């Protein structure tokens, strides 16, 4: 007797390579986490499985990786001086930036905080700060 083959499909959300060409579109909507890294960076390699694990667990979030060697101008625009650096957006608004390899629990806590935010208040404050910076 032959049994039907069953295949298990795992819903994996791969990380996205972020470049200066796709950056603005990538951070525009929803929750986005950006990992600034370099291949020569030991702590970056230690953080990579944490970041990848979170991307597999939270398929509704965009997880982007910015290679600081290939995207030096993009890294400079964020003022990245130490890697890895994790940057978080929600609805196109940058809300968090921290250098260092975070443990999985800290990444999960950050995601929970990002999900819980009242974006109406934050959007209003962000627009106010942008207007002040532009001298309006």
Task: Describe each PLM feature range.
Residues 6-25, 60-62:
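N-terminal "domain-start" segment that seeds a small globular fold
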Residues 28-39:
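Short active-site neighborhood of thiol/selenol oxidoreductases, capturing the structured segment around
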Residues 31-33, 46-66, 72:
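Conserved helix-turn-beta segment immediately C-terminal to the redox Cys motif
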Residues 32, 72, 78-87:
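Structural micro-motif
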Residues 41-44:
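Short cysteine clusters
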Residues 87-121:
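Non-catalytic, surface beta->alpha helical segment in thiol-disulfide oxidoreductase systems
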Residues 119-136:
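CheY-like receiver
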């Amino acid at each position: 007797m032959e049994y039907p083959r069953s295949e298990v499909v795992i819903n994996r959300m791969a990380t996205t390579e972020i470049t200066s060409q796709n950056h603005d579109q990538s951070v525009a909507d929803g929750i986005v986490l950006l990992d600034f890294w370099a291949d020569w960076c030991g702590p970056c390699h230690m953080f990579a499985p944490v970041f990848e694990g979170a991307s597999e667990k939270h398929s509704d979030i965009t997880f982007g990786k910015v290679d600081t060697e290939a995207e030096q101008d993009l890294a400079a625009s964020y003022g990245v001086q130490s890697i890895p650096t994790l940057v978080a957006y929600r609805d196109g608004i940058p809300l968090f930036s921290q250098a260092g390899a975070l443990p999985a629990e800290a990444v999960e806590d950050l995601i929970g905080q990002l999900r819980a935010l009242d974006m109406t208040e934050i959007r209003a404050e962000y627009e106010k700060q942008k207007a002040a910076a532009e001298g309006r």
